[in-house]
């Protein structure tokens, strides 16, 4: 559960309505893989991830980034039940993929940076603070099965 004020929830929802999930998802996942290269080990089947340009132009990275942000969108629609919303993904990432749950926090922070880059002045400190709460809540929900 994420505790947002009415104003924070409105700001998150308003900005998210303008997000191009295809573009932002691929960019966020790509930046995660470039900035934190050890995360690439979970994506061996994605082909060439040898350089930043290769990562950022990789169609599998873009497609998976879109999928990730689709799940994030579902979370935004269920802020009062993030653990339930992400239960299956938490189980998958914990039991089958063995993803370090710290990676969820890293991806959330990268997503906030990408949103700031795309929205500039519209991504005010207040909007950033609200998104930091949301990505922290999503990361906690995804890490739930690890506990």
Swiss-Prot record:
Residues found modified as S-nitrosocysteine: 94
Residues with Phosphothreonine modification: 13
Modification N6-acetyllysine occurs at: 60, 83, 145
Subunit-structure text: Heterotetramer of two alpha chains and two beta chains.
UniProt-recorded name of the protein: Hemoglobin subunit beta
Molecular function as annotated in GO: haptoglobin binding; heme binding; hemoglobin alpha binding; metal ion binding; organic acid binding; oxygen binding; oxygen carrier activity; peroxidase activity
Organism ancestry: Eukaryota, Metazoa, Chordata, Craniata, Vertebrata
Domain Globin span(s) in chain numbering: 3-147
PANTHER family cross-referenced by the UniProt entry: HEMOGLOBIN FAMILY MEMBER, HEMOGLOBIN SUBUNIT BETA
Binding annotation for heme b: 64, 93
Keywords assigned by UniProt, alphabetized: Acetylation, Heme, Iron, Metal-binding, Oxygen transport, Phosphoprotein, S-nitrosylation, Transport
Listed SUPFAM superfamilies: Globin-like
Biological role stated in the UniProt entry: Involved in oxygen transport from the lung to the various peripheral tissues.
Gene Ontology cellular component annotations, sorted alphabetically: blood microparticle; haptoglobin-hemoglobin complex; hemoglobin complex
Residues modified as Phosphoserine: 45
Originating organism: Lagothrix lagotricha (Brown woolly monkey)
């Amino acid at each position: 559960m994420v505790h947002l004020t009415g104003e924070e929830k409105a700001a998150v929802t308003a900005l998210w309505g303008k997000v191009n999930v295809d573009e932002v998802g691929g960019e966020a996942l790509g930046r995660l893989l470039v900035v934190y290269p050890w995360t690439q080990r979970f994506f061996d089947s994605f082909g060439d991830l040898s350089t930043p340009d290769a990562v950022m132009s990789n169609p599998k990275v873009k497609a998976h980034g879109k999928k990730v942000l689709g799940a994030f969108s579902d979370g935004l629609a269920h802020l009062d039940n993030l653990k339930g919303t992400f239960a299956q993904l938490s189980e998958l990432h914990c039991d089958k993929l063995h993803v370090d749950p710290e990676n969820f926090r890293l991806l959330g922070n990268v997503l906030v940076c990408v949103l700031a880059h795309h929205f500039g002045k519209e991504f005010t400190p207040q909007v950033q603070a609200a998104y930091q709460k949301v990505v922290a809540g999503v990361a906690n929900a995804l890490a739930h099965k690890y506990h």
